Design a protein with these regions (language model features):
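Conserved alpha/beta-hydrolase catalytic His-Asp/Glu region
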Residues: 160-206, 215
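Active-site loop/oxyanion-hole signature of alpha/beta-hydrolase fold enzymes
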Residues: 61-107, 270
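Conserved alpha/beta-hydrolase "acid-adjacent" motif
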Residues: 232-238
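Conserved HGGG/HGGXW glycine-rich cap/lid loop of the alpha/beta-hydrolase fold
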Residues: 8-73
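Catalytic histidine-centered segment of alpha/beta-hydrolase-like enzymes
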Residues: 257-269
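Short beta-strand/loop motif that positions the catalytic acidic residue
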Residues: 219, 225-227
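Flexible "cap/lid" loop of the alpha/beta hydrolase fold
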Residues: 125-158
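Short glycine-enriched nucleophile-adjacent loop
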Residues: 109-120, 126
Length: 278
């Protein structure tokens, strides 16, 4: 379904009923909202990993952010983390969803962090997967070079400093295998609906200046951080800034896990499921 929010329609999909038979009664289960990674991709990868597991005991709500996937493209000036956070707030109001658990991974964690900073009481629990509060290009480049060699480091530097179609192509060729593992690159490119102009626009216009560190302490929801040690786009040092900035956040590190933590460390799925449904 599509829900209108401030000049755009957001694509939303559901898995699992909110009310479930429990003997002669109906039992209400938690609602969990998932915000995808990116920029420029959609929610579909999660329907093969965390989504089905969580939907066993909760109502799962998948959202494509404005400009992403099956949501309206909107206009480039709206492709900003603040707008996506505002959209999420309006979407929950339109759907009548009160204080859900919210999951955000990688790029999606930026939107979820901003949402949780602006409306601390609007969510019950927060799950962040490989979250960072700022881009930190030197760290990103250094980690790509460490894990993927000089070609990966050079491609990461070129795209973040001079984002365009050419440098994005080189980034995808050299860097995605390091981020995801070589076997996952083709599915990652073919399965989602990509908006590559958005990818370029966001990196060029907002990525270098965005910094959410100062307001991390505003987040009051119970928070679980799930982190892989080998995601070069979201380095350990940058993730640790989020861990240290959110009061009472707990963190679980998965050694050797890359960007797709759920695939590299399947045991993380159970941890997230137990956290959001308990």
């Amino acid at each position: 379904m599509r829900v209108a929010v401030d000049g755009a329609r957001l694509f939303v999909d559901f898995a699992g009923a909110k009310l479930r038979p429990d003997g002669p009664w109906l039992r209400e289960v938690p609602t969990v909202v998932l915000v995808h990674t990116g920029p420029g991709t959609d929610h579909t990868a999660y329907k093969e990993t965390i989504g089905p597991a969580v939907a066993e005991d909760a109502q799962m709500v998948y959202v494509d952010l404005r400009g992403h996937g099956r949501s309206d493209p909107s206009t480039p000036d709206t492709w900003r983390v603040g707008t996506w956070a505002d959209d999420l707030r309006v979407l929950l109001e339109r759907l009548g969803i009160e204080r859900p658990a919210v999951i955000g991974g990688g790029f999606g964690a930026l939107t979820v962090l901003r949402f949780a900073q602006r409306w601390p009481d609007a969510l019950s629990k927060l799950v962040l997967v490989n979250p960072v509060a700022r881009n930190g290009v030197p760290r990103v480049v250094a980690r790509f070079e460490e894990l993927g060699g000089a070609p990966a480091g050079e491609a990461a530097h070129a795209f973040h400093e001079h984002p365009d179609e050419h440098t994005l192509t080189q980034y995808m060729h050299q860097c995605l295998p390091v981020m995801l593992g070589p076997h996952y690159v083709v599915p990652a490119m073919l399965t989602p609906i990509w908006n590559l102009p958005l990818t370029i626009e966001w990196v060029r216009e907002e990525a270098s200046s965005l910094d959410l560190r100062d307001e991390l302490a505003r987040i009051s929801a119970e928070t679980l951080i799930v982190a892989g040690t080998d995601d070069p786009q979201y380095p350990v040092a940058s993730i640790e800034e989020v861990v240290e900035g959110i009061p009472h956040a707990s963190v679980r590190w998965y050694q050797g896990a890359r960007h797709a933590v759920y695939r590299d460390a399947p045991e993380s799925i159970r941890m997230v499921k137990d956290f959001v449904t308990r």
